[in-house]
A protein has these predicted regions:
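Basic/polar, cationic surfaces and motifs that engage anionic cell-wall
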Residues: 25-71, 76-78, 148, 156-228
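Surface-exposed intrinsically disordered loops and tails
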Residues: 10-33
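Alpha-helical segment that forms one wall of the substrate-binding/catalytic cleft
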Residues: 1-16, 164-178
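Active-site-adjacent loop/helix surface patches within enzyme catalytic domains
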Residues: 61-184
């Protein structure tokens, strides 16, 4: 019997009929015989994927979410999510994309923090959902949405990013989060709803919020709640 079945190069999958299902995890063709053999990192990859599913309820590759989790400028372990809140960065500098903001946040260089940054090409997760962001505290909890009961998504507006594609990715992400928690679009809010701040600015200025909620509901496969 093989002692390390997950990494032994002699372990083939063809006999078990499951090669098509494990190939994408890093399986390599077995040079010493017919079939497929697990590479060295196979076991760890399985554990990483299972860990992510347990933590977020989503396979990361489905949303192409890149994790760059910060532990600064937040409320560790104090968030009990009840809302998904949409923001915009208001940062029009070239290069101010999702990765740049995520890096700055991880390094502790941003006073305001969120759980996700989205641009037209990528999504970065920057806080665990159980950690509260410094995102809507300016509302002082007057409207029921706080830093300790919300998941916050920031849409990047840098000029080289396609803004409307970024908005679409944010709609998909919001839909995924709402489905994960079993919520309807009545739990989808703007920063404005939490504090009356004019944010997300461009969505507000262009009157896009009803469409944002409609498309989010469509991605969820449901009808939108009453617009707010």
């Amino acid at each position: 019997a093989l002692e390390q079945r997950c990494i032994d190069p002699r372990f083939t999958y063809v006999k078990r009929g499951c090669a098509p299902y494990v190939e994408w995890l890093g399986i390599q063709e077995n040079p010493s015989g017919a079939g497929w053999a697990a590479g060295k990192g196979y076991g760890n990859k399985i554990l990483d994927i299972l860990s992510n599913i347990l933590e977020t309820g989503e396979r990361e590759e489905d949303m192409n979410i890149i994790k760059m989790l910060a532990k600064k400028n937040c409320y560790p372990g104090q968030n009990k999510p009840a809302y998904v809140v949409i923001h915009e960065t208001d940062n029009w500098s070239r290069g101010a994309d999702a990765k740049a903001h995520a890096t700055a946040m991880k390094n502790g260089n941003l006073a305001g923090t969120v759980h996700y940054y989205v641009d037209s090409g990528s999504i970065y997760q920057t806080l665990d959902h159980k950690d509260g962001a410094w995102a809507v505290g300016d509302g002082g909890g007057r409207y029921g949405i706080t830093n300790r009961n919300s998941i916050n998504i920031e849409i990047c507006v840098n000029p080289e990013s396609d803004y409307y594609k970024a908005v679409d990715k944010a709609e998909q992400l919001a839909a995924s989060l709402l489905k994960q928690y079993g919520w309807g679009t009545d739990r989808l809010k703007r920063h404005y709803d939490a504090s009356r701040k004019h944010c997300p600015r461009r969505i507000q200025d262009e009157g896009l919020w009803p469409e944002f909620k409609r498309k989010t509901a469509a991605y969820m496969g449901t009808a939108p709640e009453k617009p707010t």
